[in-house]
Amino acid sequence: MEKPYNKNEGNLENEGKPEDEVEPDDEGKSDEEEKPDAEGKTECEGKRKAEGEPGDEGQLEDKGSQEKQGKSEGEGKPQGEGKPASQAKPEGQPRAAEKRPAGDYVPRKAKRKTDRGTDDSPKDSQEDLQERHLSSEEMMRECGDVSRAQEELRKKQKMGGFHWMQRDVQDPFAPRGQRGVRGVRGGGRGQRGLHDIPYL
């Protein structure tokens, strides 16, 4: 009992944890885990300042979540694994971008696009309203023209659709015989008398 207690007594990272969760392998990892944590913060803050986004509240939340992540990584590892966090993850990527709750994540490009749209939209909408502002008479004329054009189109389509039926329309009561059954173009009119013959 005395050995694990003495080993972890001076370890800053394990102060708030119960003794059950403390692992003796964590002693060598604590310094290496803190380095990428600090680097990730500075990279993330530098990017935000360069972009000029007001993100003070978001920075505070990110820092808190990063510290929690650093502690939880040490807890979840089995005793057999001795890899430090800096070897497992490349240092080129900022730590904040690796693990973040899905609800908090908003892509930066999408933010920029929506911001641009809201800045320009009031001016554009006023111009559009002025252009669209027509008198009621003009509106009625336009609507009338459109409806007339649609009616004409319908009539043309109906008339065009019946061109192939004109032969049958001319003599609707003519005897049909086997025309519909054969499927021959022209209805098989040349063989009208064949259906009267009982045997061929």
Curated annotation (Swiss-Prot):
Stated role: May be involved in transcriptional regulation.
Assigned keywords, A-Z: Nucleus, Phosphoprotein, Transcription, Transcription regulation
Entry annotated with the keyword Transmembrane: no
Stretches with biased composition (Basic and acidic residues): 37-52, 60-80, 115-154
Phosphoserine sites (modified residues): 30, 65
Name of encoding gene: TCEAL6
A cellular component annotation (GO) from this entry: nucleus
Skewed-composition ranges (Acidic residues): 20-36
InterPro entries, per database record: TF_A-like/BEX
Subcellular location: Nucleus
Record family assignment: Belongs to the TFS-II family. TFA subfamily.
Highest taxon in the source lineage: Eukaryota
Name of the featured protein: Transcription elongation factor A protein-like 6
UniProt region (Disordered), positions on chain: 1-200
Primary residence: nucleus
Source species of the chain: Homo sapiens
